[in-house]
Amino acid sequence: MRSVARLLCSLALVTAFAMLAPLCGHAQTANGNGKAARMRFQEQVVMLPKAAIPSRIDLEATVFKPAGDGPFPLVVINHGKAPGRPAMQGRARFPAQSVEFLRRGYAVVLPMRQGFARSGGAYVGGSCDIEANGMMQADDVVATLDFMATQPYVDMERIVVIGQSHGGLTTMAFSTIGYPGVLGVINFAGGLRNLNCPDWEERLVDAFASYGGLARYPSLWVYGDNDSYWPVPLPGRMFNAFKARATGPAAQSRLLDVGEFGNDSHRVFSAREGIPVWLPEVGNFFRSLGLPFDAGT
């Protein structure tokens, strides 16, 4: 029975790596005339390789591809960390948010980092070293981009990396890495809170300061005033610490304060209702990078 189970598992991984049998979908969007427009796309779940010691780790990822052959510019969306065991966290899809990029001609990939969902390895975290945590998470973004570079429909010269909550910290840590084709990064309510560390807020500010000194790309930061994780004035402190150290393209960083959003502005990206709040400024950021952001019909 064990040999049969291993065989079935191997076959499943081969299928995932080959990206066979994609799931087709469609979404209702509004065109310029206010009418519903139907958009087709493909959703695929893959297990992508990450080099690790002593052996390779496979990361679960969701890939959304617009209809057509491409090549399509790429958006990477990095997930946050839900309470509880990371291995029990569900696969991130952010379907409503992903569709906004799909309908503008972007492929979207959402990797589950090491130890999350069906990704292999153990979750890297738990210590009070927030800066190191972010850098270790950023390795998974590199592995994701390396995998997407093998897909013929992806334009690897036009990449934007986005992250929410813990994924925002991951994204800003990744911004210290010079990866060809990455043009900018967006941080939605990014950070990491460890209440077992009495000085976690100072460590978080220091982590962003360190990232700022090494960052390589323009960035847009999106935070609110009633964030259950990052109370005011912490978002401003994190941003200012980053910007004070940033040079070159990274000095082109901007903080968008969305004010109060519902009961918790930490959800401004993950909640469907938040899309109209941030989408116009995200569009402006894309255009500032020389990227298109007009919705197709």
Predicted regions and their residues:
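Short glycine-enriched nucleophile-adjacent loop
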Residues: G168-Y179
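Cap/lid segment of the alpha/beta-hydrolase catalytic domain
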Residues: A82-F94, E100, L110-M136
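Alpha/beta-hydrolase fold nucleophile elbow
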Residues: V154-Q164
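The feature captures the conserved acid-bearing segment of alpha/beta-hydrolase catalytic domains
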Residues: G184, G190-T247
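Alpha/beta-hydrolase active-site loop
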Residues: D129-P152
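N-terminal cap/lid segment of alpha/beta-hydrolase-fold proteins
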Residues: N31-D69
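C-terminal catalytic histidine-bearing segment of alpha/beta-hydrolase fold enzymes
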Residues: T247-T297
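Short beta-strand element of the alpha/beta-hydrolase
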Residues: P71-G80
